Amino acid sequence: MGGDFAPQATVAGALLALGELDPRHTLQLVGRSGVVGEQLDALLIEPQYESLGAHRSRAEIVEAPDVIEMTDKPAAAIRGKPNSSMLVGLKLQAEGKSDGFVSAGNTGAQMAASMVVLRLHTGVKRPAIATLFPTGRKPIVVLDSGANVDCSPDELVQFARLGVVYAEDLLGRENPAVGLLSIGEEPEKGNAVSKEAHQLLQAAGLNFLGNVEGRDLPAGACDRGPIDVVVCDGFVGNVVLKFYEAVAPLITRMLVKAGVDEKTMMGALKQLDYSEHGGAPLLGVNGVSIISHGKSSPRAIKNAIKVAVQAVETRMNEHIGRHLA
């Protein structure tokens, strides 16, 4: 039950999700049961949530007394807090008692716990965080966006394969086009890792467009056509992600200062809001583990849960296993 605004935002997001999901779906709220139960009761008497009371029977509370803080070191947290909501929640999935896991808690701990509990698919060297980036065309998948600060050329190729499955299953793209993020479109541009990765991607049997530049991300396309998947290491990916997150608020402030109506601007820039997409799957683990922003609102949690449901319903995890076998 992690996140900067937990448990309120997490429980509220779960209620919103239950209100929109098919009635056959249920949720497990994992955390300190007394705290979660009190939060659930408090929300259901609020005007904006009271109509969701009929869905409470679809929300099961699972006790997990330990709390992994945002400041905890991942390895120490996993060893020292075995009854945290993160570990308990992931173990439910590993034991077949749930189908997916969503958290807005400590990202490093979630990554480490997912690898320990769910384990990696056979052949996967490292998992990658796959984040949806809004563009002037359609959203694109960028990975890795923070799991691995250093990557080998082989790992970047593997990330491309993971991203292709994501684009096919969750975005409905046919023969997704892959770009390698670099400092120029020419194959010889970039560092040693990106130049070797370029050669490997050309021979990987994917719809590889070649190198793409930072300016191509907002457009969702390069000179060679539309982009569906962008591959980079987690250091670069996370820098780009954090920059993207700051764009909408910055533009809004600038235009409001210039006299443009704030409500109008927020509506126009809605697609740049991370809460629209909710969460990013940790691809490569043998299960569904969705990483949400630490500052996730109830709406963001709701959308992250919907991403998890979509991943389960499209059997994305099985497809990844077959694709990398």
Model-derived segments and spans:
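Solvent-exposed alpha-helices and their adjacent loops that cap or buttress functional pockets
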Residues: G19-L21, L52-H55, I78-P82, L92-G96, ...
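Short, glycine-rich nucleotide/cofactor-binding loops
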Residues: M1-Q8, I78, A147-V157, I291-P298
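N-terminal glycine-rich anion-binding loop in soluble enzyme alpha/beta folds
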Residues: D4-M70
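Glycine-rich phosphate/nucleotide-binding loop
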Residues: T10, M115-V142, A219-V230, G234-A325
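Glycine-rich phosphate/diphosphate-binding loop of Rossmann-like nucleotide-binding domains
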Residues: Q8-A9, L21-Q28, S33, V149-G214, ...
